[in-house]
Amino acid sequence: MLFLCLSTVFFIPSLSAEEPSEPIPLHILAVNDFHGQISPGQKINGTPVGSIPVLGAYLSNATETYGVNNTIIALPGDLTGASPAESNLLLDEPAILFFNRFVTGDWKKTDSTQSGGRVIATLGNHEFDRNVSELLRLINGGNGDTNITHLVDPYPGALWPVIAANVYWNGTENLVFAPYVIEHVNGIPVAFIGAVTQVTSEISEPEKVASVVFTDEADAINAQVQALQKEGIHAFVVLLHEGGTQTPYDGPTRETGDLSGRVASIVIRLDEDVDVVLSGHTHAFTNQFLPNAGGKPTLVTQAYSYSSAYADVSLALDTQSRDVVNSSATIITTYADQGPGQIPDTNAQELLDAVNTTVAPFTSQVIATTDIPLTRTPDENGEALLYNIVTDAFRWYMKTDMSILNIGSLRADIDAGEITTGEAYSVMPFHDQINIVQMTGQQILDLLNQQWTRTVKPDHLLQISGFTYSYDESREPQDRVIHITFEGKDLDMNKKYTVATTDFLISGGDGYTVMKEGDVIAYGALDVDEFIEYLKSIPSPIHQKTGGRIIRVGNQSEDAMTAG
């Protein structure tokens, strides 16, 4: 008996001394705010980026490098909506078909292959641009209400899970979508939970989202985490369509950073088991660890927008605890002339060619003509011709007193000659919603002065319609506007005026925080739709000129100003 006991004592340390298994790698390729940007045209520092042939090459190369069984493509919202013409006219189906290609191997196929990859998506606010029923069709499949030839007939829908833990049918406790999906990586379960920004109902047209309710993101995520913890799951990745801003840098995640914005206030409330938050919505760079509710570091990423980049997230999964024991990320820009971008994805190129052939008869429709180029270049006063026409369009369509738009909203000039629907979409690829905000004369004055006090692009002036103003750059930045005229009279500082502008500006975009002081009183259509309708309504050819709306003192007499 003594020998047996000694033998037992001898063998126990031997078992405990075995080398632990190596952690299992999981690589997540996160593409946020794609917005149907299937075509080339985007540039960073003058270098072409994005498009599905280029993005497809990057994602395919990364998947091949890491291994299909250890790679997941994640889409943290706004995959569709606010899309260019070629996507928009096809009801955003090309974006879905492109990512189906990573599951099926071919965008035309409608069933997954045994060796197919994995894709997971959550929703963004722009997924609700048309309405909830159309969103469900886009996800679940079935031909949409369009007379354009279908690329795949019948349209198959998304061949991958779409998750959202905080979207409920109005008046019920029923979720519209599955809140999470469990993916197994070498036998280790990893939970992916989705959530869309709670303010979706505030930044969408009310009738489009009347049937659903968006609840608090952190509460919804935590509820799912706690339920799944009871099932023994401890590795959690969140797809969150909400974001912030951070100073960009190259390379892997750094220990410190300056991330700010609404995403930070959400992460700090998340359960300590949440390992990664793949964010979106703000079209910005994010790559930082933030403390969660338990004080543990949560990796937070975001990779710009419009197919120009993706977040390459590397996780290490412990085989014993089945938890994430290491995490890091790098934001990869999808340069077309570098790395994988030099050999475009042939299957994605085939899809893009099919799209362009299909929509050509529609994008080539002539809506107006112009005798002169309509450019975005400001004159000596800071006034730009194309912006004058666009702000006139918004004021006309929304029937407001004024219209205000930030430089940078328009992304292409229009050459002399015929103006097509395709060109209109090129001018306005962001597809901002135009709303009416009510502001006092004092708030309008403060907003105009903020052009020189904000830290974002202080040399870019706002573009206007419906009023005139003069400014003097020799005065203090906060007091440069010296005169505002509306309908031939001085602007009344106490009176309220209606202003047509973008949802981007209303939210304080480009540093115009004064805009947030106004009251949104009505919601309109997308900018490009209003622009097209306006061009159809005015005489052609267009021969409008700049002058008289914005006057820099020293260039012209202020008396020369006329209402625009």
Residue map of PLM features:
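Classical eukaryotic N-terminal signal peptides for Sec-dependent ER targeting/secretion
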Residues: 1-3
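Non-catalytic terminal accessory segments
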Residues: 17-31, 35, 43, 47-52, ...
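N-terminal signal peptide
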Residues: 7-21
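Acidic, metal/ion-coordinating pockets
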Residues: 18-335, 381-393, 453-456, 460, ...
